[in-house]
């Protein structure tokens, strides 16, 4: 992958493993440890240009200066009152993606995008209201984590693939990013969460990799009728089949599945819905995350009250379903769940 080729044909180095970078350095007749130095400077020191790696011989630095590391630019940064920071990152082709840094007392979490836009068109989600452009490459995903880590000057402890896009439609690059975040950046697999609305066959394909990551399935409904209304792709992936595949995932990996459930007042928040959901999940190694709807301008869904949320939670727990309410972060900067969208999908300066 990283043999000595013309600059135009060499992919960005970000996302490459220590072994790959060692081999790459050797193609330039450099000793193996030079590749290890490049690895350290890319992943630990956050270098944006190979010419800035001062421990390398000056002549070689000049020779490789034009080979891209694969880092993006911060196009815009906005901080919410709760400390959450939303970033618009400008990619090499001018496309804009969103990334969110979410600090808590215990850890720094990064919510990464896996696509530019999203083709799934979920009714309550801002990203789905915009145009889908393309999949992100591995380096464009890993870069988001390093960018937040550098900006906060704090080590990232948790990464969730819950930003723009459907990760399982970009499974190859997402898996490559998971490997790099784990082995190169040093984030444990159990601190990585991949979210999906459910893509036929892809959950089973993911299970074959036997990863220790968390799979989060965006369920959002207790029956097929409501789910089809909220998630158009559910027409091609019935709820029963989705849940069957999730059970198979648990069996194959030994990891419980997290079910994300955006609560919409008057739509999917009634006691009957909670009991229906509990029926589906009884005996299932799972956890339900209840997420209060975060408003977007295109639709008139209503956010539930705290009382409604608590009643729904109580109904689930009365049926012995493990569940919790997720606190919304970054709401005042449109950085909360379901609110992500790049206000400029392409930077005007690049066109």
Swiss-Prot record:
Gene3D superfamilies linked to this entry: 1.10.150.530, Aldolase class I
Top enzyme category: transferase
Domain Radical SAM core residue range list: 104-332
Cofactor note text: Binds 1 [4Fe-4S] cluster. The cluster is coordinated with 3 cysteines and an exchangeable S-adenosyl-L-methionine.
UniProt-annotated catalytic positions: 98, 337
GO CC list: cytoplasm
SUPFAM superfamilies named among the record's database cross-references: Radical SAM enzymes
Protein name: Probable dual-specificity RNA methyltransferase RlmN
Organism in which the protein naturally occurs: Acaryochloris marina (strain MBIC 11017)
């Amino acid at each position: 992958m990283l043999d000595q080729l013309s600059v135009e044909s060499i992919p960005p180095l970000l996302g490459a493993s220590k072994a790959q970078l060692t081999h790459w350095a050797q193609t330039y007749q450099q000793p193996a440890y030079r590749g290890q130095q490049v690895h350290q400077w890319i992943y630990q020191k956050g270098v944006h240009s190979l010419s800035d790696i001062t421990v390398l011989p000056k002549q070689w630095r000049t020779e490789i200066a034009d080979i891209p590391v694969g880092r993006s630019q911060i196009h815009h940064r906005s901080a919410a009152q709760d400390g959450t920071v939303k970033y618009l990152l400008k990619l090499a082709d001018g496309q804009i993606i969103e990334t969110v840094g979410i600090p808590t007392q215990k850890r720094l979490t990064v919510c990464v995008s896996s696509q530019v836009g999203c083709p799934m068109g979920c009714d309550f989600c801002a990203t789905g209201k915009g145009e889908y452009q393309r999949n992100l490459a591995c380096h464009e995903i890993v870069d988001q984590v390093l960018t937040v880590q550098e900006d906060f000057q704090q080590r990232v402890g948790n990464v969730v693939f819950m930003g723009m896009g459907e990760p399982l439609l970009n499974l190859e690059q997402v898996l490559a990013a998971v490997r790099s975040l784990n082995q190169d950046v040093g984030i444990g697999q159990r601190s990585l969460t991949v979210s999906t609305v459910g893509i036929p066959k892809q959950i089973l394909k993911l299970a074959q990799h036997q990863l220790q990551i968390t799979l989060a399935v965006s369920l959002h409904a207790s029956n097929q009728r409501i789910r089809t209304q909220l998630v158009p792709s559910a027409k091609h992936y019935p709820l029963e089949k989705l849940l069957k595949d999730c059970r198979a995932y648990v069996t194959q990996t030994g990891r419980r599945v997290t079910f994300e459930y955006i609560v919409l007042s008057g739509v999917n928040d009634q006691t009957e819905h909670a009991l229906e959901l509990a029926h589906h999940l009884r005996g299932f190694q799972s956890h339900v995350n209840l997420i209060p709807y975060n408003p977007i301008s295109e639709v008139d869904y209503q956010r539930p009250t705290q009382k409604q949320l608590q009643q729904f939670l109580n109904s689930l727990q009365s049926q012995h379903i493990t569940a919790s309410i997720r606190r919304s972060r970054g709401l005042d900067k449109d950085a909360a769940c379901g609110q992500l969208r790049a206000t400029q999908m392409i930077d005007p300066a690049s066109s």
